[in-house]
From Swiss-Prot:
A molecular-function term among this protein's GO annotations: 3'-5'-RNA exonuclease activity
Residue ranges occupied by any 3'-5' exonuclease domain in the UniProt entry: 289-455
SMART domains cross-referenced by the UniProt entry: 35EXOc (SM00474), HRDC (SM00341)
Residues modified to Phosphoserine: 821
Lineage: Eukaryota, Metazoa, Chordata, Craniata, Vertebrata
Chain ranges of the HRDC domain: 503-583
Protein name, UniProt field: Exosome complex component 10
Annotated EC: 3.1.13.-
Recorded name of the encoding gene: Exosc10
A Gene Ontology BP annotation from the UniProt entry: histone mRNA catabolic process
Cofactor: Mg(2+)
Compositionally biased region (Basic and acidic residues): 1-10, 217-230, 732-756, 776-794
Length: 885
C-alpha cells in the first residue's frame, strides 16, 4: 500500500528519455504535469489506506485494547504531526501543533489546520493568477531617481538602497552611551534649572552701539545688591526705592542685549550685489581642526575676524538634560573646517561673540530658529548679520526646505543621516561622527552663493528678494530663550492635547504626577521624557493602581527614576484616590471663551465688524489708556445712580441700522429741524402709495358713478381721476394738524416748566411751602380725575337710556305654566329587575356570607346611568367603559 517513490516513478518505462537535471522543473520530474500525476497518485493511495483503518466505534475500541496497535497509532500520529508542522513552518504559519494541552487539544489542532489550509490555498490562488496573467507584478510608476525616500521614524528603521545608490541595507541605531560620565559634572558653572525666568549670561558686549546694562555686568553680578534699608530713610520710602530699582533692573535684564544693534542693522552693500558663486573645495583637500582648548579657540576667533563670511551649525542633546546641552559647534570658512568641543569650552565660548556679532561678517545658518536660542542658553552668544538658507529656500518655493535637499540640489551630494540621532556627548568622537558633523557646514557657503544668485535673478536684478531674506533672518536673531516655567495650571495644556476625559480622581493624579515629574526633572537635570514619558503618566493617571507594582506595570520599559521613587509616586496616587469622585470641569472652566457671535451675511454692504458707531454710547464702559480699569464718564462725589455693569467687549453689535427713514417722534419734531437728507427721505416716503388704500371713494364727497359711464373709457378715467381719491390723501390733513397741535402743546408745557424752575431758582421757597404746593397739585390731579370719571359714567347712562328709548319692549304674551302632573316619572325610578352589568364596577362591594336582617334592604342598580339623565341614548359622544373581568 505504500506509494511509489520518485525514483521508481523516474525509472518507469512510461517516462521515456529523461532530461538533464538542469532542465527539470522539479528534481526527478521533467515537467509539472508529471509531478501532478505522481502527487495525485500518492494522495489517492493515502486516502485508500486511511479508509482501511478501523472505524470509530466498537471496532476501533476493540483494536485499541491491544498494546501493539496502540503503540503503532501513537508512533504514526507523531510522524504525521511532525510532517504537518514542517509544512506549516515552511508557509510561515504557526507550527506548534504538538505543544497543546489535553483539554482543548483536538479543537486547537483543527483550528491550526484550517488556518494553514486557508493560507496555502490563498497563496496558490495568487500564484495561479500570476501564471495566467490576471494579476501581474506592479512596477513602480516613478523612475528610480524620483522615488520618495523612506522617512526615518526612529533609529531602528531600515533604509535599503536609497535612490539606487546603495544596494546593501544599512541599519540605523541610536548611538547612546549608557555608562558615559555626565558632562554637567565638569562644568564650572552649575546649570540653573530653577523655576525662574532665564537670566542672560552675557557680561561683555563686543561690537556694541549701545552699552550693556549695568545689571548684566560681571561686577554687578558678583557684588551683593545694596538694599535701601541700609540708608537712613523711612521703611516705606525704602520699599518704594527698592521697587523702582527692581522694575528698572527687570526691564534691562530681560531685554535682548543686541536689540538696538539689530533694529538699526542694514546689510553691507557687497552682499546686495550680483554674487559670483565660489565652488567649494573637496573634503579630502580641506583641512579640519578640532578645537578643544582655550588657545585654539582664541586662534579660531582671530581667523573668523579676517573672513567675510563663515557657516555655523550646532549639535544638540536634549534627552539627558532638562534644558538641553549644546555638544558641538561646526564652523566652516572657504578654506578650512573647524569642530569646536563646546562641552570642554563651555565657560570660554563667550570669546566668539566678537566674531558672531560683527555686522560686517555674514554668518550663514540653516534653520537657525533653535540654534539662536541654544547659543544664548548655553554660552551667552548672539548673532548679528545672519543669512538663513532655510528662509531663502522658503522664499524660492523649493520642493523641500531641508539641508539634505539643498545638498542634493546644488551640490549633488547625498548626505548620510546615519548619525542624526546619535548621542553627541560621547568623547572621544568617532571618525564617522566627525565627518557627519563636518558635512553640515562644508558645503553651506556654496549653497549660500547659489541661493543669492537665484534670489537676485528672481528679483529682476534687484536686491529686493535678498533684503527680504535678511529681514527674516534678523527677526530670528531677535529671538530670546524662554525657560519653561511651572505653574499650577501647566498640566492643563498637556491634558487638552491628549483628548481624553478624566474624572476628578484621575485629573488630580495627573496633576500630582505632572508636578512630581517637573520637580524631579529639575533636581536631577533630566528631561521629561527620561523621568516619565507623557503616555506612561497618562496611563498611570487613568488606571490609579492601588499597589506600587501596578505603577510599574503601567510603564514598559520602566524609567529608572520611576523605579527609584516608586514609593513617593504611590503616595501621590493614594492621595488622588481620596478625592471625591466627580466629573472634572477644571479644563472646561479654564477655557473662558464666550459664545461666538452670530455670523453676519457678507453680502450686506453696511456690515463692518469694527463699526460700533451705531451702538448706544451707554452700552460699554470707557476704558483707560492701558485697558485695565474702566473709567467713569461723569465723575461725581455722591453717585446715587445704578452701577453700570461692565459688558464684555466681545459682544460687539455688528448690525447696521438705517435711521434716515424713521419718523421722528412728536417731541423731537418740534425741537430739532430736519436735515436735508431727512427732508428728502420724507418726500420719498410721502410719494409712496399704500396699495391697500388705493381707489377708495372720498369720505367727504360721496360721488355716484353711473353704470353707463363704466363702458366709456374716457368717462371711466375721468371718474377715477376726479371723483375717486386715496384715503391716505384725505387723512393727511387731519394727521398733520394733530401733529402740529401735539407739538404746540409740548412746547407750551416745556416753556411753563422752564419759567417755573427759573422762578423757583430766583426766589427760594421754604420747605413747608413746597410741601403745601405738592399737596395742592395732588388734590388738583385727584379732582380732575374724579370729574373725568363722573362725566364718563354720566355719558354711559345717557347712552343706555337712549338705546332703551329707541328699542321699546315687544308686547307680552299670555303665560301658562307647565303641568307636571301628566308627566311620567318612571324614567327616573330605574329598573329593579335589571340584569347585573357585565362591566366591572370598582365601587361595588363583594357580598359577604352573613346577612344583616336588622338593616333595611337597599338595592342599588349597578351599571345604570345617573338619575339626572334619561334612559335613552346620550348625545355626549364618547363614553368611558370600565375593563371587563
Amino acid at each position: 500500500m505504500a506509494p511509489p517513490s520518485p525514483r521508481e516513478h523516474q525509472s518507469a518505462p512510461a517516462t521515456g528519455a529523461t532530461k538533464p537535471d538542469a532542465e527539470m522543473v522539479l528534481p526527478g520530474f521533467p515537467d509539472a504535469d508529471s509531478f501532478v500525476k505522481f502527487a495525485l497518485g500518492s494522495v489517492v493511495a493515502v486516502t485508500k489506506a486511511s479508509g482501511g483503518l478501523p472505524q470509530v466505534g466498537d471496532e476501533y475500541d476493540f483494536y485499541r485494547s491491544f498494546p501493539a496497535f496502540q503503540a503503532f497509532c501513537e508512533t504514526q500520529g507523531d510522524r504525521l504531526l511532525q510532517c504537518m508542522s514542517r509544512v506549516m513552518q515552511y508557509h510561515g504559519c504557526r507550527s506548534n501543533i504538538k505543544d497543546r494541552s489535553k483539554v482543548t487539544e483536538l479543537e486547537d489542532k483543527f483550528d491550526l489546520l484550517v488556518d494553514t489550509n486557508d493560507v496555502i490555498l490563498e497563496r496558490v490562488g495568487i500564484l495561479l493568477d500570476e501564471a495566467s496573467g490576471v494579476n501581474k507584478h506592479q512596477q513602480p510608476v516613478l523612475p528610480a531617481g524620483l522615488q520618495v525616500p523612506k522617512t526615518i521614524v526612529s533609529s531602528w528603521n531600515r533604509k535599503a538602497g536609497e535612490y539606487g545608490k546603495k544596494a546593501k541595507a544599512e541599519t540605523f541605531r541610536l548611538l547612546h552611551a549608557k555608562n558615559i560620565l555626565r558632562p554637567q559634572l565638569r562644568f564650572r558653572e552649575k546649570i540653573d534649572n530653577s523655576n525662574t525666568p532665564f537670566l542672560p549670561k552675557i557680561f561683555v558686549k563686543p561690537n556694541a552701539r549701545k552699552p550693556l546694562p549695568q545689571a548684566l555686568s560681571k561686577e554687578r553680578r558678583e557684588r551683593p545688591q545694596d538694599r535701601p534699608e541700609d540708608l537712613d530713610v523711612p521703611p516705606a520710602l525704602a520699599d518704594f526705592i527698592h521697587q523702582q530699582r527692581a522694575q528698572q533692573v527687570e526691564q534691562d535684564v530681560f531685554a535682548h542685549p543686541y536689540q538696538y544693534e539689530l533694529d538699526h542693522f542694514t546689510p553691507p552693500p557687497s552682499v546686495l550685489q550680483r554674487p559670483q558663486p565660489q565652488l567649494y573645495r573637496p573634503v579630502e583637500e580641506t583641512p579640519c581642526h578640532v578645537v578643544s582648548s582655550l588657545d585654539e579657540l582664541v586662534e579660531l576667533n582671530e581667523k573668523l575676524l579676517g573672513c567675510q563670511e563663515f557657516a555655523v551649525d550646532l549639535e544638540h542633546h536634549s534627552y539627558r538634560s532638562f534644558l538641553g546641552l549644546t555638544c558641538l559647534m561646526q564652523i566652516s570658512t572657504r578654506t578650512e573646517d573647524f569642530i569646536v568641543d563646546t562641552l570642554e569650552l563651555r565657560s570660554d565660548m563667550y570669546i566668539l561673540n566678537e566674531s558672531l556679532t560683527d555686522p560686517a561678517i555674514v554668518k550663514v545658518f540653516h534653520g537657525a530658529d533653535s540654534d539662536i536660542e541654544w547659543l544664548q542658553k548655553d554660552f551667552g552668544l548672539y548673532v548679528v548679520n545672519m543669512f538663513d538658507t532655510h528662509q531663502a529656500a522658503r522664499l524660492l518655493n523649493l520642493a523641500r526646505h531641508s539641508l539634505d535637499h539643498l545638498l542634493r540640489l546644488y551640490c549633488g551630494v547625498e548626505s548620510n543621516k546615519q548619525y542624526q540621532l546619535a548621542d553627541w556627548r560621547i568623547r572621544p568622537l568617532p571618525e564617522e561622527m566627525l565627518n557627519y558633523a563636518r558635512d553640515d557646514t562644508h558645503y553651506l557657503l556654496y549653497i549660500y552663493d547659489r541661493m543669492r544668485l537665484e534670489l537676485w535673478e528672481r528679483g529682476n536684478d534687484q536686491p529686493v528678494q535678498l533684503q527680504v531674506v535678511w529681514q527674516r533672518s534678523r527677526d530670528i536673531c531677535l529671538k530670546k530663550f524662554v525657560k519653561p516655567i511651572f505653574t499650577d495650571e501647566s498640566y492643563l495644556e498637556l491634558y487638552r492635547k491628549q483628548k481624553k476625559h478624566l474624572n476628578s480622581q484621575q485629573l488630580t493624579a495627573f496633576q500630582l504626577l505632572f508636578a512630581w515629574r517637573d520637580k524631579t526633572a529639575r533636581r536631577e537635570d533630566e528631561s521629561y521624557g527620561y523621568v516619565l514619558p507623557n503616555h506612561m503618566m497618562l496611563k498611570i493617571a487613568e488606571e490609579l493602581p492601588k499597589e506600587p507594582q501596578g505603577i510599574i506595570a503601567c510603564c514598559n520599559p520602566v524609567p529608572p527614576l520611576v523605579r527609584q521613587q516608586i514609593n513617593e509616586m504611590h503616595l501621590l496616587i493614594q492621595q488622588a484616590r481620596e478625592m471625591p469622585l466627580l466629573k472634572s470641569e477644571t479644563a472646561a472652566g479654564v477655557k473662558k471663551s464666550g459664545p461666538l457671535p452670530s455670523a453676519e451675511r457678507l453680502e450686506n454692504d453696511l456690515f463692518g465688524p469694527h463699526d460700533c458707531s451705531h451702538a448706544p454710547p451707554d452700552n460699554y464702559p470707557v476704558t483707560s489708556t492701558d485697558g485695565t480699569m474702566p473709567l467713569q464718564k461723569q465723575p461725581s462725589l455722591f453717585d446715587e445712580g445704578k452701577e453700570e455693569t461692565s459688558v464684555d467687549a466681545r459682544c460687539l453689535l455688528a448690525t447696521a441700522v438705517i435711521t434716515l427713514f424713521s419718523e421722528p417722534s412728536t417731541e423731537e419734531a418740534g425741537k430739532t429741524p430736519l436735515t436735508v437728507a431727512q427732508k428728502k427721505a420724507q418726500s420719498i416716503m410721502e410719494s409712496f402709495e399704500n396699495p391697500f388704500r388705493m381707489f377708495l371713494p372720498s369720505l367727504e364727497n360721496k360721488a355716484h358713478i353711473s353704470q353707463a359711464a363704466k363702458f366709456d373709457p374716457s368717462s371711466k378715467i375721468y371718474e377715477i381721476s376726479n371723483r375717486w381719491k386715496l384715503a391716505s390723501q384725505v387723512q393727511k390733513e387731519p394727521k398733520e394738524a394733530a401733529k402740529k397741535k401735539v407739538a404746540e402743546q409740548t412746547a407750551a408745557r416745556e416753556e411753563t416748566k422752564e419759567e417755573s424752575t427759573a422762578a423757583v431758582l430766583e426766589q427760594p421757597i421754604p420747605v413747608r411751602q413746597q410741601a403745601a404746593l405738592e399737596n395742592a397739585t395732588k388734590k388738583r390731579e385727584r379732582a380732575t380725575s374724579d370729574l373725568r370719571t363722573i362725566e364718563q359714567k354720566q355719558e354711559k347712562k345717557r347712552l343706555k337710556s337712549s338705546k332703551k328709548a329707541k328699542d321699546p319692549d315687544p308686547p307680552g304674551k299670555d303665560f301658562s305654566p307647565y303641568d307636571y302632573s301628566q308627566s311620567d316619572f318612571g324614567a327616573f325610578a330605574g329598573d329593579s329587575k335589571s340584569k347585573p352589568s357585565s362591566q366591572f364596577d370598582p365601587n361595588k362591594v363583594a357580598p359577604s356570607g352573613k346577612k344583616c336582617f336588622g338593616a333595611k334592604k337597599f338595592k342599588q342598580s349597578v351599571g345604570n346611568k345617573s338619575m339626572s339623565f334619561p334612559a335613552g341614548k346620550s348625545d355626549r359622544g364618547f363614553r368611558h367603559n370600565w375593563p371587563k373581568r
